[in-house]
Amino acid sequence: MKNKNSEQNTHYTIGEQDIHYFHEGKHIYAYEFMGAHKACEEGIEGIRFTTWAPNAKSICVIGDFNYWQVEDKNYMEPITDAGLWSVFIPNAKNGDKYKFVVTNKDTSHYVYKSDPYAFFSELRPNTASIITTETQYTWSDDKWLEKRAKTNYYDNPMNVYELHLASWKTKNGKFLTYDELSETLPQYIKEMGYTHVEFMPLHEHPLDASWGYQPTGFYSVNSRHGDIIGLKRLVDKLHNNDIGVILDWVPGHFCKDQHGLIYFDGSPCYEYQEPTKAINKGWETHNFDLGRNEVKCFLISNAMYWINEFHIDGLRVDAVSNILYLNYDREDGQWIPNIYGGHENLEGIAFLKELNGVLKHTCKGVITIAEESSSWPDISTPVEKGGLGFDFKWNMGWMNDTLRYISLDPVYRKYHHNLITFSMVYHYSEKFILSISHDEVVHGKKSLINKMWGDLWNKYAGLRLYMSYMIGHPGKKLIFMGSEFVQFVEWREYEQLQWQVVDQYESHKQTLHFFKKLNDFYHNETALWQCDYDHHGFRWIDANNSQQSILSFIRSSKDNKQKLIFICNFTPVTYYDYHLGVPDAGSYKEVFNSDNLEFGGSGQVMATEIFSSPQSSHGFEQRITIKIPPMATLVLKLIK
């Protein structure tokens, strides 16, 4: 098995070692020989096609090179008893479209299939694979990759901008190409102060409305936006602007369209044999058989493909709960317990551990993030310590609790104060990312601004308050596109964001400015990210002031030289002469205030320093007396 950390060769032939590791489930570069590859055999240039179909009777390759006719010379030959098939076709070339005609050995029924390992595919509704051998690109991101390999993301800033390429911006109603995006996206993300962009799935999928989460071409770059070189150029440009690239990745299930992986050889192949495990009724997809060696190779090699070929810096693994639980989204009687009588998917657990183990060993500095909605333990604990091995986990509990809280009338918030404080009870159990993702602004859930309580002024103030509280809360950050300039309608994947409102309305322009300033503040203050997962980095001042719906806490840097005091007022009431305990004697200065006039607030700011007095309050020996603006987050800093 070739240990490969660079782009694929123009010529590569399958060897005995490749075959052995593939069937053992240990090949992590299967894309180097599976699929369609340029080859020279007996002095003749052509393409070698290889696929896996253990229950096939025959497989014929048809395409542009043979006028889509089934011909004897284009039938694959079995090269192992375990289902590997291969054929060399001399006149096939780069750019030719093709498919596999797969005949089942039991029924003699045949199906037309796209190549599971194809690097490029036709734009929907067409479904043919496309021979793609010209994928070489000269990268210019060496400095970024060197820095990435040395970075400890736990004690560095991470502020992620989640993005759906098809609807971020369009041009005359048409998708932007990767090259067109390269001209605007990196600059925008850099100017806004985000450290990473997270792309929703970029592999080929037939249905736009699936957002990429029901893929058919796991190795095929989304053809809506261009080709492989274009995507590489976009990633390169992002890296040269010091922006990391995270990719949403879907290893749990796949689309059931007939040209895809479903019943690839006429019988369960990539999916489980048992219908209770294979069929995902909730999403109308099929679940991967994660205990099958060749399927594990397909998926882990796919992760390696995106990381090696496109220099992806991290994978956000979608729907981890669906991988972990046999009874996920199933009623009693619709699932079969494991060998120990439990609901845990033992094969799924082993797969996730193996995936994370491989990436940790081979891809220095690449991170994995779990989207997991249950309380499964040790998701972000290293594999060698008994965990699943992810670097981070989305904090779905924090998201649900706080969005519920912020939608309440402030009159009633006092009765639900735990919703805004409970997250710190379990925060240190995982390496959490606080995420306000695409899932929260669709399907009737309302846009982020419309989740806020009150009239228009209070909605804007509530959004600024909430986002400032989020920046202060321990954990890395993620927000979905459009929220930064206050899109009022829910996200619609079929049209671009409503960018025009920034030019039309001052309130939208002010909020965009607020997000930029907030992101800059986060990036510049070590206390906000250096100790996200260390108890030293956070301390409550007062978590129990439910009557006034005020939170106050301290964020500290590792060396304790930086301390920030957050005061979050979740009511539309101004509090005068508010006594607050502080850890140190001295003078305190306001360093951020979400009520600032330049953000659209009421302008109740602290223009002068506040001096502490030696009076006990909130368990501290010193206290300050301040005015707290309505629906606002105030941040103070000890200056001397």
From Swiss-Prot:
- Which reaction is catalysed here? Transfers a segment of a (1->4)-alpha-D-glucan chain to a primary hydroxy group in a similar glucan chain
MF (Gene Ontology): 1,4-alpha-glucan branching enzyme activity; cation binding; hydrolase activity, hydrolyzing O-glycosyl compounds
Which pathway, metabolic or otherwise, does it act in?
Glycan biosynthesis; glycogen biosynthesis
Q: Which GO terms describe its cellular component?
A: cytosol
Enzyme Commission identifier(s): 2.4.1.18
Regions annotated as coiled coil: none
Keywords, A to Z, come to: Carbohydrate metabolism, Glycogen biosynthesis, Glycogen metabolism, Glycosyltransferase, Transferase
- Could you tell me which PANTHER family the record lists for this protein? 1,4-ALPHA-GLUCAN-BRANCHING ENZYME (PTHR43651:SF3)
Assembly description? Monomer.
Q: What does this protein do?
A: Catalyzes the formation of the alpha-1,6-glucosidic linkages in glycogen by scission of a 1,4-alpha-linked oligosaccharide from growing alpha-1,4-glucan chains and the subsequent attachment of the oligosaccharide to the alpha-1,6 position.
* Name of this protein: 1,4-alpha-glucan branching enzyme GlgB
This protein's encoding gene = glgB
